[in-house]
Amino acid sequence: MADALLHPEAQYLSLMRRAWETGVERSDRTGTGTRALFGEVMRFDLSDGSVPLLTTKKIFWKSAVKELIWFLSGDTNIRPLVAQGVHIWTDWPLAKYNAANAPPNSPISRDAFEARIIEDADFAAKWGDLGPVYGFQWRHWPDGSPDGIDQIAALIASIKANPASRRHIFTGWNVAQLDQMALPPCHMTYQYFVANGR
């Protein structure tokens, strides 16, 4: 694939062009609709320490970094995100709370819900959890043991012990738990390739 040699932003723009020109129109759960392509892959060379952020659209990169750190922590509760001003995951537990508790036609606002999440640890524990989303799958993949499999620790150990392995992979797509997640993973499988010690 020639695009794999392109700068990350050029890969993204090329993908957007292909989706616009040849993508199939599809309906989605949000009612917005999409143009879709099947099986597209983007490859990023991270060996120089760069991060593939876009400059052609507004990116809330600080929130993205906070979210990634939250994933890597293994947490599944929105409380740490909300405490840092990251609201990207609030809608799912808020909708669940409103469906269970709000009087008809008077749901609690996002601001009021987030304030309760911050102020009340018990409320956050009950209503702020997203189920076994990214962080849980990455750090506690269920295997019958109390802590599960820490895919991130296993990945790092594998890269250090056997850099040439083709098995430097982790995933968030756990078919057995998709229905328990607030939202199934959008980005779900990652593979690392070590070449010449990098």
Language model regions located:
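Terminal, non-catalytic protein-protein interaction segments that mediate quaternary/complex assembly
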Residues: 1-198
